[in-house]
Amino acid sequence: MSDNETYRDAALRGLDYTLGRNALAQSYVRGYGTKVPQNVHSRLYAHQLDDTVPRAPPGSMAGGANENASDPPADDVLQGCAPQTCYVDDVNSYSTNEVAINWGSALAWVVNWAATQ
């Protein structure tokens, strides 16, 4: 990435945050940690809405805390929340709990890179 350790350290802190070193002690990656997303927003893995549909597989990453959350479940629960605590594990919370390939692929790259550090 860079010979500058400032960038290395920042990337590792970001990964730590994603994996649970945050205000909620919440891992945003399914299958890693003890407090993980159960009800990610996904058209493929909407288990909360239909228990015949599987949960998202391990390695799926939810979007995470978002102080500008803008969906009905977040609006109902997160009014006035402190930054980094604005998260709701609900299948309909697309602003905090959606899985997407753009951040899932970045997670795969960062985890692979971090393993070499």
Task: Please tell me what each predicted stretch does.
Residues 1-117:
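Aromatic (Trp/Tyr) and acidic
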